[in-house]
């Protein structure tokens, strides 16, 4: 029987990875996804209730969350390391050291070069998945020794590069560019997206926004309800100084884009972003006047289930769709 490469690499039952989300994916969500057979991932500021610039405190909070996940499940899980640049790298270095000390099974590395922490993590026996946005970056990650790459299309929520390659185009490009396993994300919320991803050459899927709207998610109830109410054209791409972000359309995005259009200086734009950042939405419940990262799949989200039920329902539906697709393929025989 042919084994799925991501399942074999990570020791999981289903090739479904819950993407790390800032202020959202804490121990409860991570453990729930891992326990049901996928791979949960602790995101930045997991378990935090306020913004804390202290590096040591940030590292210790990550350690506490790792311990909490292990108290809830014995299944493999991942922790996100956002490499960053310049002064911000002091945070990622601390998180990386905690991962090594705690012998975390998997690290999902993003927002930075793949050669920064890969060697150290792998020497500690940690599997490394690196997030990229182009085939060229995927090749560089492979050369740096990562175990798998994660490609995210233009549909994806949150921060990404300035390229506008959609998941449908990016996935086969990356699959052709590297020999290591490929996980794809951006616009995937249900069994249809997973089926498409596998057909495009991916070994697994990376789902964020759909898991944001689950009971275990640390996202504020106001934000969850905003995503449930979201209609078809509900997100917008927001250009920032160093990268793009895809956000749920609200008063925040309208005002920010108006400031950009008016020619506001970079300092003013950055101050506005800081004053209306995701923390205000995810923990204070300001679903209108703060930034909410979201994929275009928000228009497909209609309920707030437990993460376990979500995964189980996706797998059950996926089996039906595989059978239906096999029937449809008979026309090509």
Feature roles, as predicted:
Residues 1-177:
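Active-site entrance/lid segments in N-terminal catalytic domains of soluble metabolic enzymes
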Residues 70-97, 183-192, 242-256:
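Electropositive, surface-exposed helix/loop patches at the edges of structured domains
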Residues 161-183, 189-333:
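Conserved active-site-proximal phosphate/metal-binding subdomains
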